[in-house]
Amino acid sequence: MPETPRLLFVHAHPDDESLSNGATIAHYAARGAQVHVVTCTLGEEGEVIGDRWAQLAVDHADQLGGYRIGELTAALQRLGVDAPIYLGGAGRWRDSGMAGTEQRSRRRFVDADDREAVGALVAIIRELRPHVVVTYDPDGGYGHPDHVQAHVVTTAAVAAAGSVGDCDYPGDPWVVPKFYWTVLGVSAFLAGRQALTPDDLLPEWVLPPEDIPFIYPDERIDAVVTGDSDARAAKIAALAAHATQVTVGPSGRACALSNNMALPILADEHYLLVAGRAGARDERGWEIDLLAGLGFTGFGT
């Protein structure tokens, strides 16, 4: 019986998986791959949209993190993933908030003991033995401290998981064949932004600038996963499940966070290959399957 491909996505907060990789996760899950998502915090510091759940926020009941477990569970189910995995267990590390956020009583993810956090992820990698691991670039995408920390922890864990000589971590060594950063490609972003019309937006939303600092030029891209209509629909449904954090527009072509900046909901999701050997590339120089070169068939776009 042929081996089932396994992919692991590591994210900082609930909703990051749907915003960054929702179409990719749905694409591979629908084709029978084993897909898992590790989330590093409960997202306690998130800014709540609307009045219904506003009292859950950190400055009131401080119950948002627990509520977001349900949102993440629902979102993952819509993407085809059974259940969330929390690094160190649910609630081990608190959402650190943006730079300058007041420190709370429980240990923030950015203050996690490096060996403990890395060890927790090494244990997951060695248990699940993923063929592909995905996390943020060194800047954490848009720079959130927890995204940067997730990059640091994941990079160290991928290296340590395959080390035969490191016996301090549980499990048998596993060398991850391909390690990617999730990034936002400039052409896809600008095309998506340009295509938005007033019918796609709520009245209070504004379009983002064309030169947002964390988009990547096409020549730096190594891979793209293009979700079909089903994968895109799953991504939209997953984003809608994160209702305390994300509002999906009336047409399903855009969404916004609490800052009311409209973001196109893209079916194309882009990646940089930072470890492992690339598979076949298209005329743009891009892989169109994160599993390319690993001997799996039927999982490309």
Curated annotation (Swiss-Prot):
Q: Which cofactor does it need?
A: Zn(2+)
Residues that hold Zn(2+) according to the record = 13, 16, 147
Give its E.C. classification number: 3.5.1.103
Q: Tell whether Hydrolase is among the UniProt keywords.
A: yes
Q: Name one GO molecular function term.
A: zinc ion binding
Any coiled-coil ranges, and where?
Answer: none
For this UniProt record, give its keywords in alphabetical order, as a comma-separated list: Hydrolase, Metal-binding, Zinc
Q: What is this protein called?
A: 1D-myo-inositol 2-acetamido-2-deoxy-alpha-D-glucopyranoside deacetylase
